[in-house]
Amino acid sequence: MSTEEKALNFIEQIIEEDLKNGLSATKLRFRFPPEPNGYLHIGHASAIALNFGLGIDYNAPVNLRFDDTNPAKEEQEFVDAIKRDVEWLGYHWSEERYASDYFQQLYDWTIEFIKKGKAYVDSQSSEEMAIQKGTPSTAGTDSPFRNRSVEENLDLFQRMKAGEFEEGTHILRSKIDMKSTNMLMRDPIMYRILHKHHHRTGDQWCIYPMYDWAHGESDYLEQISHSFCTLEFLPHRELYDWFLDQIYDSNLVRPKQREFARRNLSHTVVSKRKLLQLVKENHVKGWDDPRMSTISGLRRRGYTPASLRNFANTTGIAKRDNLIDVSVLEFCIREDLNKTAPRVMAVLDPVKLVITNYPTGKEEWLDAENNQEDENAGFRKIPFSRELYIEREDFLEEAPAKFFRLSIDKEVRLKNGYIVKGESVIKNSVGIITEIHATYDTESLSGSGTEASQRKVSGTLHWVSVAHAIEAEVRLYDRLFLDEAPDSHKEKDFLEFVNPDSLSVVTGFVEPSLKTAQNEDKFQFQRLGYFTVDKDSSSERLVFNKTVGLKDAWEEKGKKEENSLNNSLKEINKFFKVDSDAERNEVENLIKESIQAVANFSLLQNVLKKNIANNKSSLLFANFMLKHSSQITPKDFDEETIQKLYTMSLRSESPFVRIEAIRNLQKDVFSLNALGTFLENLKATEKDEKVKELLLSV
């Protein structure tokens, strides 16, 4: 690998250092080792890009190894899906391997462990073993079965293999150090009994190796030079090395485990358990639901292999876990589709536009550029006629000055077509506009070169011809979770943050060029965003998934929410300046509206914490947030934080702050009890009559 082309990340630096220290480049070998118990997600895509990318950079083989050591959760369906996803991402493995390929070798090594006194059969219950193992701050104690004889251990282990015992009656543990500061080194489990059918080995085995025993040894058997995994496996490295020490042949390559940070993506979850929960509880429609963080879900939504590879490269490799905003991923797909997606016209909330001076029965086929970013994309023909569909939001009967779309007596251009002027409307019995009537400038055809065609008007609208439009189902997807880190709040179930509006389905109309569109074909619906043909499409009905908007609507929403809270904090000062209760209520109601308009839990939580300060305005605002927000409660904060808010507020110079703190405390029984002595002391010293009256009622 050329080190001059780019700065090396710390993973590449490790490899380069090993090469300098004598490791032959021909000995480099990497692997991607998924467990086939679910579908791959965006986090796996980054690990895939890392390992296969290293294989490409160093011209080294990369194995795809399935860590299939738990038949209770693993299925062939997941094996097939993983292979499909890796290939779709554009990567090719050198060898397809399975941990189950090595079951016999692992068993043989284990027999040697037992013979050397390095492993024993433990017959404790899981509860007994948990107590005996100790805690991070207290040493463990030896199992009462730790000193079984070699003969007894061999007999029991072979009988475990023969299927004589029920699950949970015995396990095999390695004999290491029950006083180790690393809990994983306190005689870790090597084998457990599982009477489950294995998707590859059938019922041949009923004892299965644990991850820590199988993983490093699989690396060793495959002669993997570098075993890269995420940071949660850092404590496992000591055990990884200990197991290798017992079997290592100095004539062979010794694998090296090193760790990198997990990429957590905002507004989603990547835990397989939580993804499975979303599927099983019908919050989504399967593993490939376009709202899921699975690769199959992202693919169905319209993400491309190039966009996911670019995302992995853009976010890079880090040593600390970090939260990547989903807008980075959305930027990557916009960048890709902007270059490759044909531009077409579709109307998703249609209202009929009738051009009254356009001849009845006439139609024109106009030239439309397929993609201005690709000079080779060419042009297509689109039909223009007297009756068109436009977006309902693109017309206002009475429009403000800065409305740059169609209205009465106002001109706009129809994309690739003519300039039209709004004249009148037809409404139904309840006042909803059903038709907009307009006239067109006959000399204003776009691209005709006439003086009229070059006139500047306030805006350009997309449209489709009513007579030629194809009806389509359009699925408008939004972020699955309202909170940026839904599973990071100990006090909350992540499902509480599921976005109830993450999917809306509309019937729209698309131009006729899309009649032959196939599954996974991608388009830019002009002015609306990027859309992908869904697998549910048929010859009778097209179905499109919204991949991503042309702009990040959530960024705008986030800024609005943040600005709303900041402006409310400024309003708080007025509360202290006005004289009457009525005026204070008016100020509080304005602040209340701003607080209740914010749905972002993390934003609310962080802003409240920041306002626990020795400042009456900040403290009053924090109490108002607790009082008026439907998103946060005292239970969403740790005990120390919430009690700090109360105690600082109750000591505030402002009686208004003290009053709001007491009102919040009245609804927070836990904190009320915890601060009982503090409140009793305040009752004796409080001088403000209103505050004292409230205190006495507590």
Go through each PLM region and give its residues.
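Alpha-helix N-cap/helix-start positions at coil->helix boundaries
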Residues: 580-584, 613-619, 655-656, 685-690
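N-terminal catalytic cores of NTP/NDP-binding nucleotidyl/phosphoryl-transfer enzymes
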Residues: 6-83, 199-230
